[in-house]
């Protein structure tokens, strides 16, 4: 069986690219189609597969400025020819799911999210954009939304990465979807005996929507030790925000081994973003450590309040402070058991993802076969 995997872009490695790697364990000989591909940043991960890029790859600085090419993405993805393939699988948070496939070829879309910047977060993105970007957003986005909806109707099987995203798919595309949680590679994340438990951790790319500022402000006000792990555009402003607070340290980008050690020994992970799913909270839980999280988005499906962590209801520092105090009160009573937390995280393993995805692909193939027979 000849399989194509379509991914929005391969310019860095994150949770979405991890999903592609797991799908490749089911279909190791699949060809990969993508808008643009930066081999230097992706490394050797997909070196054993044919990677086909769009015509946009030829543009200068395409791998750096790909987000500015939204207007041209629909045509780029629709230009890929899948007439010689038996199965097409899309991994999409943007336009990848809009490919056109032959009638007898199953088209499965694993959706990380419908385009945030086209739908419910349009005004947030617009507010943070420069004048020129706003000019084009105001003139192009209605057309992008129309294409996004229309292209979603030609997918045979829609898979959402969480119930939260399934609700967004129903809202914006008027489609039902099944939920298969992303694979979490938990092998290296394990509990340790006698963790130090003398600091909190905030780990992510340091970009605005991750809201690391909330963790910084909350721990600064409470005098709690906080280790901020990661790098990004907000790093300088966050360090300025934490100035004078000796209890807050920044590590920058670190190795997986060091990250694991920090998670294994922390009091808890503080997670302030509204994410579609959020793998980091599960990595912390796999280490047996609880999570203090903003109670909105996919994290509501991966953290059990009062058992594997606590939620705070508002995306503010004051709400996070109250959650930290609540967490510490519960922790003193022995509410959070390392073994229970790690066992909960194990239910999101890669093995589970592969099993569920295989079953979904089998159902998609059967549905398309029945459709072809009836015609």
Model-derived segments and spans:
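Nucleotide-activated donor-binding/catalytic signature segment of Leloir-type glycosyltransferases, i.e.
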Residues: 236-257
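Acidic donor-binding loop of glycosyltransferase active sites
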Residues: 264-276, 289
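Conserved acidic donor-binding segment of nucleotide-sugar-dependent glycosyltransferases
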Residues: 305-306, 310-317, 325-332
């Amino acid at each position: 069986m000849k399989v194509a995997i379509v991914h929005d872009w391969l310019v860095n490695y994150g949770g979405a690219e991890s999903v592609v790697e797991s799908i490749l364990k089911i279909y190791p000989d699949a060809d990969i189609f993508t808008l643009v591909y930066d081999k230097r940043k992706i490394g050797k991960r997909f070196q054993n597969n044919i990677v086909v890029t769009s015509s946009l790859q030829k543009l200068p600085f395409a791998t750096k400025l790909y987000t500015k090419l939204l207007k041209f993405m629909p045509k780029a993805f629709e230009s890929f020819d899948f007439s010689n393939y038996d199965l097409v699988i899309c991994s999409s948070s943007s336009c990848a799911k809009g490919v056109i496939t032959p009638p007898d070829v199953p088209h499965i879309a694993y959706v990380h999210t419908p385009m945030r910047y086209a739908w419910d977060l349009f005004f947030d993105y617009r507010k943070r954009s420069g004048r020129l970007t706003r000019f084009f957003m105001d003139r192009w986005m209605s057309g992008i939304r129309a294409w996004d909806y229309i292209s979603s109707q030609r997918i045979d099987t829609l898979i959402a990465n969480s119930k939260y995203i399934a609700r967004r798919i129903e809202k914006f595309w008027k489609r039902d979807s099944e939920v298969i949680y992303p694979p979490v590679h938990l092998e290296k994340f394990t509990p340790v005996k006698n963790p130090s438990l003398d600091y909190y951790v905030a780990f992510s790319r340091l970009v605005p929507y991750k809201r690391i500022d909330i963790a910084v402000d909350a721990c600064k006000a409470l005098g709690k030790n906080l280790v901020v792990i990661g790098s990004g555009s907000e790093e300088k402003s966050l360090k300025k925000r934490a100035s004078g607070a000796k209890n807050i340290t920044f590590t920058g980008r670190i190795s997986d081994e060091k990250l694991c050690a920090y998670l294994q020994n922390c009091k808890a992970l503080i997670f302030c973003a509204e994410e579609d799913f959020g793998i980091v909270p599960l990595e912390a839980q796999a280490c047996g450590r609880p999570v203090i999280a903003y109670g909105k988005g996919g994290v509501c499906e991966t953290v059990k309040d009062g058992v594997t962590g606590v939620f705070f209801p508002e995306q503010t520092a004051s709400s996070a402070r109250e959650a930290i105090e609540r967490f510490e009160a519960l922790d003193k009573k022995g509410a959070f058991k390392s073994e229970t937390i790690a066992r909960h995280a194990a239910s999101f393993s890669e093995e589970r993802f592969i099993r569920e995805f295989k079953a979904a692909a089998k159902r998609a193939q059967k549905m398309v076969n029945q459709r072809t027979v009836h015609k």
